[in-house]
């Protein structure tokens, strides 16, 4: 475990322990993962490296580790990570996967990036994602698609596909992601890794390029629940001066309750998550996971989330509406792409946005502008907000009967790249099980629980009540202590 050939098979917790014991250096570790990431560039997971910055951070971590004599160093000191390119970073490009921001370099770091850096994380680079985090297949990036390491002809999921693929391929031990309607959980499921979206407001959105401001949330992606707990502890905390939606709650140690028994835990199983449209292979893997949780002492409770089907139209009204507002700032005036030739200011706006945005982003801007327009606001946007409240109420009714909700992450395993053709509805329908929790602002996570057709990974989704991340991580950790699915590795990596 102390040789460079095995470094990429270590979890964050294992690697951090070796670094603190000085059995491996941060510099050696950074060089090893940089070499792996660059050697597997065809995966499409990375968008940018800055080797000078990465190695400088690693050397600084080694000096801090050498100077420590009382064990007071940050837990993650020297651990390498990369960030989804939706977080702005001072020393790396910040493109949001869009031609609109091609080559853009931010003058500051996102709060999540700063918090992880304060805990000693070494930044390896920036990771590919769907343009402005809009997509379920990571095919919408202006810089090319990401490939699933389990089958290079298939999607890794989206929009945090680069993060999920890089972790699954052992190009790095962990990565940041963002989740608006399932963009951490779905790619985690498709790539066989563990990922968690915390309660809305747990992690600061400052420095996250905004898609839908009432839904966007940052979270970690790693191979184990223990690693996610370590990372989430570092990422969360109040940021009142820079993010008004940040919760005024102190940072929490999510590792503290990982090993608690789940004996007697009530796990709600929503009937609506197991109906028509759920593939048999996914159903079998999820059913197997639920039976394993029963063996660990949990009790399965049938519940209902009656407005599950409404989550798709509600989400695809609210999220595009917020996107149309947020993306109005990209007009070619102050930063980002600007059309080379134009007749006047209005023409410059039109050509800049036509050239800079991809098809899916344009589609959502148009939908959002339409539902916010005079005469349609009440009929669409206001109505969607009312139903959103009802969806949140459905969850609160369910939690009167259970402690945690469990079900599939997606109706199918990862599909072929280009498999949905030019049918955006097919991508939208793939989010049906992740959207309800997102609309309610609840924490949710995905953990690998088996394989479906063509030996593609399947994830189990856990959804907790507000601020119950520790409970989700506890359930996931106990499951992973009893099973081996999270240890599976794609061939060739």
Curated annotation (Swiss-Prot):
GO CC terms of this entry: glutamyl-tRNA(Gln) amidotransferase complex
Homology family: Belongs to the amidase family. GatA subfamily.
EC number assigned by the record: 6.3.5.7
Protein name: Glutamyl-tRNA(Gln) amidotransferase subunit A
Keyword presence, Transferase: no
Enzyme class name: ligase
InterPro entries: Amidase, Amidase_CS, Amidase_dom, AS_sf, GatA, LisH
GO biological process: translation
Subunit note: Heterotrimer of A, B and C subunits.
Function: Allows the formation of correctly charged Gln-tRNA(Gln) through the transamidation of misacylated Glu-tRNA(Gln) in organisms which lack glutaminyl-tRNA synthetase. The reaction takes place in the presence of glutamine and ATP through an activated gamma-phospho-Glu-tRNA(Gln).
Organism in which the protein naturally occurs: Albidiferax ferrireducens (strain ATCC BAA-621 / DSM 15236 / T118)
Record bears the keyword ATP-binding: yes
A family per Pfam: Amidase
GO terms of molecular function: ATP binding; glutaminyl-tRNA synthase (glutamine-hydrolyzing) activity
Catalytically driven reaction(s): L-glutamyl-tRNA(Gln) + L-glutamine + ATP + H2O = L-glutaminyl-tRNA(Gln) + L-glutamate + ADP + phosphate + H(+)
NCBIfam families: gatA
Matching SUPFAM superfamilies: Amidase signature (AS) enzymes
Keywords of this entry: ATP-binding, Ligase, Nucleotide-binding, Protein biosynthesis
Record: active site: 84, 159, 183
Organism ancestry: Bacteria, Pseudomonadati, Pseudomonadota, Betaproteobacteria, Burkholderiales
């Amino acid at each position: 475990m102390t040789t460079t050939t095995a470094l990429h098979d270590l979890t964050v917790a294992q690697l951090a322990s070796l670094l603190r014991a000085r059995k491996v250096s941060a510099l050696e570790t950074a060089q090893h993962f940089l070499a792996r990431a660059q050697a597997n560039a065809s995966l499409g997971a990375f968008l940018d490296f800055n080797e000078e910055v990465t190695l400088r951070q690693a050397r600084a971590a080694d000096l801090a580790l050498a100077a420590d004599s009382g064990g007071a160093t940050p837990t993650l000191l020297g651990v390498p990570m990369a960030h989804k390119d939706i977080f702005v970073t001072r020393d790396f490009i910040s493109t949001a996967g869009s031609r609109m921001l091609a080559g853009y370099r931010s003058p500051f770091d996102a709060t999540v990036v700063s918090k992880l850096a304060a805990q000693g994380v070494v930044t390896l680079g920036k990771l590919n994602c769907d343009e402005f985090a809009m997509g379920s297949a990571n095919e919408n990036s202006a810089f090319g698609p990401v490939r699933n390491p389990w089958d290079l002809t298939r999607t890794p999921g989206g929009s945090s596909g680069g993060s999920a693929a890089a972790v699954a391929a052992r190009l790095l031990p962990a990565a940041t992601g963002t989740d608006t309607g399932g963009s951490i959980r779905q790619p985690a499921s498709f790539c066989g890794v563990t990922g968690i979206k915390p309660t809305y407001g747990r992690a600061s959105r400052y420095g996250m390029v905004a898609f839908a401001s009432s839904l966007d949330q940052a979270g970690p992606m790693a191979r184990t629940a223990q690693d996610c707990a370590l990372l989430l502890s570092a990422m969360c905390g109040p940021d009142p001066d820079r993010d008004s939606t940040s919760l005024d709650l102190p940072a929490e140690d999510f590792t503290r309750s990982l090993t608690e028994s789940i004996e007697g835990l009530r796990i709600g199983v929503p009937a609506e998550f197991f109906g028509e449209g759920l593939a048999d292979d996914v159903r079998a893997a999820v059913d197997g996971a639920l039976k394993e949780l029963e063996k660990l002492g949990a009790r399965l409770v049938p519940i209902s989330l009656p407005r599950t089907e409404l989550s798709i139209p509600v989400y695809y009204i609210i999220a595009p509406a917020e996107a149309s507002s947020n993306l109005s700032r990209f007009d070619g005036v102050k930063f980002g792409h600007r059309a080379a030739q134009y007749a006047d200011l209005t023409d410059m706006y039109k050509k800049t946005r036509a050239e800079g945005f991809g098809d899916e982003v344009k589609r959502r801007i148009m939908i959002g502008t339409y539902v916010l327009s005079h005469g349609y606001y009440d009929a669409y946007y206001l109505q969607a907000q009312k139903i959103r409240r009802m969806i949140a109420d459905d969850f609160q009714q369910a939690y009167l009967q259970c402690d945690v909700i469990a079900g599939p992450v997606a109706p199918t395993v990862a599909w072929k790249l280009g498999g949905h053709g030019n049918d955006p509805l097919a991508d939208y329908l793939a989010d049906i099980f992740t959207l309800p929790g997102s609309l309610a602002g609840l924490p949710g996570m995905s953990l690998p629980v088996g394989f479906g057709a063509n030996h593609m990974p399947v994830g189990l989704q856990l959804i907790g009540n507000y601020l119950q991340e520790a409970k989700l991580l506890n359930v996931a950790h106990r499951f992973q202590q009893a099973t081996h699915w999270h240890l599976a590795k794609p061939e060739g990596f």
